């Protein structure tokens, strides 16, 4: 839930107007809107490059995933991995745009560990995959943008660990 929504709901629950501190928080959130949009655009515009770099890094760490019997051995499995990369990158952009990790959790993390275990996908490998995705994504951002984006990737890896 965004800062604005949180403030409004909290104030309404307490039957009051937002405090000056809460309004200051909203002001700070709105002031970062342009950079959050810039980050989301950069990640979306560079999705193919980011996914390609991340998968190369992951499969150099875990070459066994691409060998016979590995989780990305077949073309279908490999393409599913790439699809998941794009999906997680998109989740990160949702969180960045909202300025909150809640969309990431609500849309993509509830039950994710159980799902990967049920599918026989090694969860530690998924954690490595998200770390590779983070490295590749932060590489297309400037230092301020990377500082803002990094915690959203970390949130996903922590949830999977």
From Swiss-Prot:
Biological process, per Gene Ontology: photosynthesis
UniProt xrefs under InterPro entries: Globin-like_sf, Phycobilisome_asu/bsu, Phycobilisome_asu/bsu_sf
Cell location: Cellular thylakoid membrane
Topological type in the membrane: Peripheral membrane protein
CDD domains: APC_alpha
Identification of the protein by name: Allophycocyanin subunit alpha-B
Family, per entry: Belongs to the phycobiliprotein family.
Domain of life: Bacteria
GO cellular component: a single term: plasma membrane-derived thylakoid membrane
PANTHER family assigned to the protein according to its UniProt record, in alphabetical order: ALLOPHYCOCYANIN ALPHA CHAIN, PHYCOBILISOME 32.1 KDA LINKER POLYPEPTIDE, PHYCOCYANIN-ASSOCIATED, ROD 2-RELATED
Main location: membrane
Record key words, sorted: Antenna complex, Bile pigment, Chromophore, Electron transport, Membrane, Methylation, Photosynthesis, Phycobilisome, Thylakoid, Transport
Native source organism of the sequence: Picosynechococcus sp. (strain ATCC 27264 / PCC 7002 / PR-6)
Post-translational modifications: Contains one covalently linked bilin chromophore. The chromophore is added by phycocyanobilin lyase CpcUS.
